[in-house]
Amino acid sequence: MTEEKKIGIEFGIMVVRAGKVLLGKRNESPETADSELHGEGTWTMPSGKLEYGETFESGAKRELMEETGIELREFRVLCVNNDKNEHAHFVTLGFLAKKYFGEAQVKEPEEITEWRWFDLNKIPNNLYIPTAKILENYKQGKFYIEGLD
């Protein structure tokens, strides 16, 4: 009997300050990068999976605090995307942090090795696919874009 594949729900939180976006470098190791979509070594925005019984708000607050130490106070839903490859399939919600407090710190070094602010016009090429899609949604002002897999 084969295992039934399931679709997960994840989110990325776009934190912007003075025209720059916060991105973290995923660990190069597949064992520690914790990426079902296999984004080892790529740049990602703070992100995570929605846990059972959690609201979008509580999940976003939890993940941003766990990964960066930043307290999310207000956000809005920016976009929804369909992210899939041969390893996994997720519906990804993009959130835009509207109000937040604190400075980014490496809180989970086994997953994210550094946090860095990038100019929105000088984003690195090696982006985690869900992050690339959320940034493209933001730049184009679109809620959904098909075909960046």
Locations of regions flagged by a protein language model:
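A short coil-to-beta-strand element that immediately follows conserved catalytic motifs
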Residues: 71-79
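Residue-level preference for beta-strand/loop junctions
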Residues: 5-7, 39-41, 89-91
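Acidic/histidine-enriched, glycine/proline-rich intrinsically disordered or flexible terminal extensions
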Residues: 140-149
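Short, well-ordered beta-strand micro-motif
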Residues: 15, 94-98, 116-119
